[in-house]
């Protein structure tokens, strides 16, 4: 009986073919080592490297799209819910039937105060929170707080609405500061992954040239604001598909309104106290709020699962290791920089113009003349105009960077002057297309303003150790402007337009003055970022260069090393410790060069 041959040949065993396999390669002890453990014969290192960095670039694009979509859904849910609840709570019949003498108007005023007043303190804690949690996790936490605010509207009481509104007010500035930092970091990463060969030639610790990431930053900011401005349109979906079915027409709601536009005083003076024909059933309200809650939860999952980290783990350790006291002080120290001081009026105007579009123009001009049932379509016109015009921020690829900002300011200047002399008659719809046209044009100016400012800050402050401070200052001033608008909501329309006009002119003049100073070669004074102080000296911190060292500090360090004498070889042929590097513990033990003996 013949023995069946083994399925696999035994190494070193002589078979019918001797000590060679079917490819003619010797088997057993004489087999060459390269044939066993060598590289794959068809492996192309350059092609694999190209594919690797292509996947990295696609990952960066995925991060930008996920962050943009998450913020769009979050703000669409937040603005839509807030608008729907304020309209329902305004109707006195709804308040009396649903809530009796609970004092719903007082709760609403406290809720709005929590949303608008709390961000004033954000400058004190935002950089600390971003450095403590990290950029991505700060975004996730802030989006979760927005979802918490949505969930509390299931049970509308003082102890649910007001605390959640205060928490939401605390999360506004951290969300936007971390988002601006995140988009800027993604543009820098995309540059690194696109020019990886240059990075290999220059060395891993060499910073890329100044402004090299600017083209990618322009594209990513245009994508982000194209998505974000759609949130104003998404916020109108509950109004269109649900609330408009219960509203009275303009002949009832505007029966006592005498003047609109530039002649108006406060917010809708004389507006009817009853705006609902029939009261919506509680079951229908729960269904709408459940849909909004599901969308908010989806936004949380998108930020959590699809957004990658903005920094490497070692970079985040370095950013936190400068000291919490320094992190707290650095936003205030950056006021020394004349560029930030010149941009503060633009920061304030950026907050003014968004609130004016959503409250001043939409209510004082649009609703006052066309009725509450057309508010949603007016804001959709603003949203679509702003979203489509965010692409105009790409003009910075071919034109000077001041062109988008100045163009947006010029457009808003013309519209503001026109609104000074426009007082539309109440309950007149013959020229309703003018309202939609003005809203769309205002959206164009808003898009140029937002994309221009965010791109400018990302170009002027591209050091990763400064970006969270800069975007915190930017959005804190926006929050201050929104607080001022909240305080002045009862002013006459002419006073609001005058404040808007003066701020706009001052912002444009201050910005052009800043650009002139930069062209003259005036060097801004920036605070020094302290070096990381690590409690544990691991292998990561024995590298030659510090990942958080600025260019000026690096040049000074190299100059100091050039003056020093060449280090002598240690015992047993130990190699020199390298320029500007302390000896590792092993070298200190061999050479007696530890800190105790210096």
From Swiss-Prot:
Changing residue 140 to W: Increases interaction with TLR3. N-glycosylated. Changing residue 151 to A/W: Strongly decreases interaction with TLR3. The keyword Heme does not apply. Changing residue 297 to W: No effect on interaction with TLR3. Changing residue 282 to W: No effect on interaction with TLR3. Residues 544-554 have a biased composition (Acidic residues). Changing residue 154 to A/W: Strongly decreases interaction with TLR3. InterPro entries: UNC93B1. The chain crosses the membrane at residues 64-84, 110-130, 132-152, 160-180, 223-243, 285-305, 343-363, 378-398, 403-423, 428-448, 469-489, 495-515. Belongs to the unc-93 family. Interacts with TLR3, TLR5, TLR7, TLR8, TLR9 and TLR13 (probably via transmembrane domain). This is Protein unc-93 homolog B1. It comes from Mus musculus. The gene is Unc93b1.
